[in-house]
Each structure stands twice: as structure tokens, then as C-alpha cells.
């Protein structure tokens, strides 16, 4: 029981250290982007890229980062299981959507003209 509490305290300290270091890296990223804007682009790009890689690596060492990595891997696995339609099916669906859209547009246009005619008959505007 005592070992478990010590291990938990050690884990909590490590977790706090990781997130603190990550916060410091983000602050460094913002400050370096602000202060080194007058320096050469190569220096600025190298610094910002290294800070980004370091902070991303540190994020993936945390518990939340590991969960995100597992979620990403399972999402990629699920996309590989999807059966995508072939060209023929895609073409048929596309033409069906186009034809239905044109038919509905013609129906709405006809209803609009009938309503305009009916309203002009009632108000005797005779358009």
C-alpha cells in the first residue's frame, strides 16, 4: 500500500513536470515567434520547428497524448475497413442527384408560376 502511494506521488510529480515543461515550451514558442521576427527566416524556422517537434513529442508522452494516439490509430484502421464505391456506382448516384435536382427545380418553378397567376387573379393585377 505504501509503495502504491509513493508510486502515485511520483507519477503525479512526473505528470506535473511534463505539463509544466509543455507550458514553458508553448510560451517559448510564442515569445520566440515575437522576438526573433527581425532575424533571418532560417533561424526562426529552425527554432520554431524544433520547439514544435519537442512539444509534440512531449504531448504524446502524457496520458492524454497516448489516448489520442490510440484513437488516431483506431480511426485509421476503421477507414481502411470502409468499402468505397467504384466509378460506375459514383457516376450513377451523381446522375441521379442531378436529375432529381432538375426535376424538383422544374416542379418548384411550376408551382411558383401557378401561385403568381393565382395571386394576380385574386388581386386583378393581370401580370
From Swiss-Prot:
Major subcellular location class: membrane
Superkingdom of the organism of origin: Bacteria
Any Pfam family: SecE
GO cellular component, one term: plasma membrane
Keyword terms of this UniProt record: Cell membrane, Membrane, Protein transport, Translocation, Transmembrane, Transmembrane helix, Transport
BP terms from Gene Ontology: intracellular protein transmembrane transport; protein secretion; protein targeting; protein transport by the Sec complex
GO molecular function: protein transmembrane transporter activity
Similarity section: Belongs to the SecE/SEC61-gamma family.
HAMAP family from the UniProt entry: SecE (MF_00422)
Protein name per its UniProtKB record: Protein translocase subunit SecE
Organism per entry: Buchnera aphidicola subsp. Baizongia pistaciae (strain Bp)
Gene for this chain: secE
Amino acid at each position: 500500500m505504501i509503495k502504491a502511494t509513493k508510486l502515485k506521488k511520483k507519477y503525479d510529480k512526473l505528470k506535473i513536470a511534463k505539463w509544466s515543461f509543455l507550458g514553458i515550451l508553448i510560451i517559448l514558442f510564442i515569445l520566440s515567434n515575437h522576438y526573433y521576427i527581425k532575424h533571418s527566416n532560417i533561424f526562426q524556422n529552425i527554432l520554431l520547428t524544433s520547439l514544435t517537434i519537442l512539444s509534440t513529442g512531449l504531448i504524446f508522452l502524457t496520458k492524454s497524448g497516448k489516448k489520442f494516439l490510440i484513437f488516431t490509430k483506431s480511426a485509421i484502421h476503421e477507414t481502411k475497413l470502409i468499402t468505397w464505391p467504384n466509378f460506375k456506382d459514383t457516376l450513377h448516384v451523381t446522375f441521379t442527384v442531378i436529375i432529381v435536382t432538375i426535376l424538383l427545380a422544374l416542379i418548384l418553378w411550376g408551382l411558383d408560376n401557378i401561385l403568381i397567376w393565382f395571386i394576380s387573379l385574386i388581386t386583378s393585377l393581370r401580370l
